[in-house]
Amino acid sequence: LPVVEALAAEGFVVSVDTSRPEIMTAAAKAGAKILNDVRGFDLTGAAEAAAATDCGLVVMHGFDAPRGSDIVASVYDYLAKRTTALRELGVSSDRICWDPGFGFGKTVEAILN
């Protein structure tokens, strides 16, 4: 994490993309201001680790939507569920950003529609 420390020391806002709770904790201590999790803070301990920091949290829908499903509803429902889990851990809404995960298991047609 020396790169995070060096960039933060220079005044940059550093975002770390990880799903691992121990990396989230270490990155925040090193000066990261944003944690971005392609799994939506869904791995065991990830939501708790993220909530224990002061970082902004990017909740991403990073996998395929079920075939034949309404992709908008599927993505929305997942992001809402993960946001509820974070809010229940005391994370304020102003720390949470949604990323619908364009390019992760979604066709160009689905993204544009």
Model-derived features: where do they sit?
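Conserved anion-binding
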Residues: 24, 30, 38-109
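Charged helix-capping and loop-helix junction motifs
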Residues: 1, 76, 111-113
